[in-house]
Amino acid sequence: MFMGEYTHTIDDKGRLIIPAKFRSQLGDDFIITRGLDHCLYGYPLIEWQAVQQRLASLPSTNANARKLVRYFYSAACECQFDKQGRVNLPANLMQHAYLERDCVVIGVASHFEIWDAERWASYQDAAASDFDQLAAGFDGLSF
């Protein structure tokens, strides 16, 4: 399970250190792709296969389903770590998430996300002010 929040810096070559706790769960190969809210999603291969199955169940006759699947898959890339635990982020993914230098890597249970640090701070501020209302909106949810 991916948990926690880690601040890192992208170097001039587009390389980002992934937290050691996450690397141990990812294995040698993993997937990074576009995520919602202008962040990046990272998946271990086993979870990526589950995502693929869910996307394959969408009706290909539905234009919005086709658009979603194309947009999601077209940016997906299989990644590996270098010897320092860094991953090279493709330019198109960095552009999607507005990544330049300072970023935050967060755990989200089955996957991890990579956010621009300023965008993450803004997102967190908005979520914090609505946290009680957000939780109340899901009947039967308890912590």
Curated annotation (Swiss-Prot):
CDD domains reported for this sequence: MraZ_C, MraZ_N
Main location: cytoplasm
Assigned GO CC terms: cytoplasm; nucleoid
GO molecular function annotation: DNA-binding transcription factor activity; transcription cis-regulatory region binding
Keywords annotated in UniProt: Cytoplasm, DNA-binding, Repeat, Transcription, Transcription regulation
Biological processes, Gene Ontology terms: negative regulation of DNA-templated transcription initiation
Localisation per UniProt entry: Cytoplasm, Nucleoid
Occurrences of domain SpoVT-AbrB (ranges): 5-47, 76-119
Pfam families xref list: MraZ (PF02381)
Listed NCBIfam families: division/cell wall cluster transcriptional repressor MraZ
Protein family per UniProt: Belongs to the MraZ family.
PANTHER family, A to Z: TRANSCRIPTIONAL REGULATOR MRAZ
Subunit structure as annotated in this protein's UniProt entry: Forms oligomers.
Protein name per Swiss-Prot or TrEMBL: Transcriptional regulator MraZ
Organism, scientific name: Limosilactobacillus fermentum (strain NBRC 3956 / LMG 18251) (Lactobacillus fermentum)
Protein's gene: mraZ
